[in-house]
Amino acid sequence: MLLVNKKILTLLFSICTISLLAILYLNFKKREIIIPGSYKEAMTYVKKIPLSEVQEKINNKEDFILFIGRESCPYCQKFAPKLAVAIQKTNQTVYYLDNDSKERKEITSFAHDMNVKTVPNLSSFKKGSKENYLTKGSKSSIDEIIELLTQ
């Protein structure tokens, strides 16, 4: 009887150890940072929304981060992978207005109203008002992007 209990305890201990190692491995693997190789790949880390939803967030006085850019912009192409890395490191939601979309005129007008002079533009909104933005645009470092995302 004692031998059977010892075998059961050993088996349970082994199962627990293997389970713990599997959980740790999966958690570590999940935290691997992927550096996107293209603008399109980088944009899989943002949530693309239409201008009407951005205006709704402003009207509802929400806190959010907004990226305005376009694939045809070489500066946006340089910035997008850094943004994707920062998003992965902070796990923040970043909304994306695509200035190459059908809403281009409306987005350009909105950007002008928000005092956005160039793309890429990453801005934080607090209670529906633009509070801060990256002044260096595509020249911003990953750490500077992270700082804006975590304010």
Predicted regions and their residues:
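N-terminal targeting signals for export/organelle localization
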Residues: 1-44, 151
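Extracytoplasmic/secreted envelope proteins and their assembly/folding machinery
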Residues: 55, 80, 84-87, 107-111, ...
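Short Fe-S-cluster ligation motifs
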Residues: 102-120
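Solvent-exposed loop/turn segments at secondary-structure junctions
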Residues: 71-74, 100-103, 129-130
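Local sequence-structure signature of Cys/Sec-based thiol-disulfide redox active-site neighborhoods
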Residues: 55-92
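Extracytoplasmic/secreted cell-surface and envelope-processing proteins
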Residues: 75-77, 106-107, 131-134
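Thiol-based oxidoreductase modules, predominantly thioredoxin-like and allied folds used
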Residues: 45-48, 68, 92-107
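Non-catalytic, surface beta->alpha helical segment in thiol-disulfide oxidoreductase systems
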Residues: 123-151
